[in-house]
């Protein structure tokens, strides 16, 4: 417990809150270029091959982003849009790629939850 004099000399320091998406730098989305597109395996109770991409953003930060939906057309040098949102069973993946924008195609034959996957309304 500090004395009054100690508090006058040096005030209490605020504990900085950790940001969940630091690479976005307070922007809702960011543009970037894929440097590597690959699959990775999730944490212990789950088993799959999750599609992820290493993306170099316009602010020169390189992040790992998840590619949602079934099937994708991304490859190296594809220009993508990134939003926040982590993938719980992939450590270090704190961003999602936005489907249906820039070089990323929407999910084919998607009927429900279409807006999240950039799919047009079926005829």
UniProtKB/Swiss-Prot annotation:
GO CC aspect terms: small ribosomal subunit
Gene: rpsL
InterPro entries assigned to the protein according to its UniProt record, in alphabetical order: NA-bd_OB-fold (IPR012340), Ribosomal_uS12 (IPR006032), Ribosomal_uS12_bac (IPR005679)
Entry similarity comment: Belongs to the universal ribosomal protein uS12 family.
Molecular functions per Gene Ontology: rRNA binding; structural constituent of ribosome; tRNA binding
Feature: compositional bias, Basic residues: 113-123
HAMAP family linked: Ribosomal_uS12_B
Gene Ontology BP annotations: translation
Organism: Oleidesulfovibrio alaskensis (strain ATCC BAA-1058 / DSM 17464 / G20)
Residues bearing PTM 3-methylthioaspartic acid: 89
Keywords noted in UniProt: Methylation, Ribonucleoprotein, Ribosomal protein, RNA-binding, rRNA-binding, tRNA-binding
Protein name: Small ribosomal subunit protein uS12
Described function: With S4 and S5 plays an important role in translational accuracy. Interacts with and stabilizes bases of the 16S rRNA that are involved in tRNA selection in the A site and with the mRNA backbone. Located at the interface of the 30S and 50S subunits, it traverses the body of the 30S subunit contacting proteins on the other side and probably holding the rRNA structure together. The combined cluster of proteins S8, S12 and S17 appears to hold together the shoulder and platform of the 30S subunit.
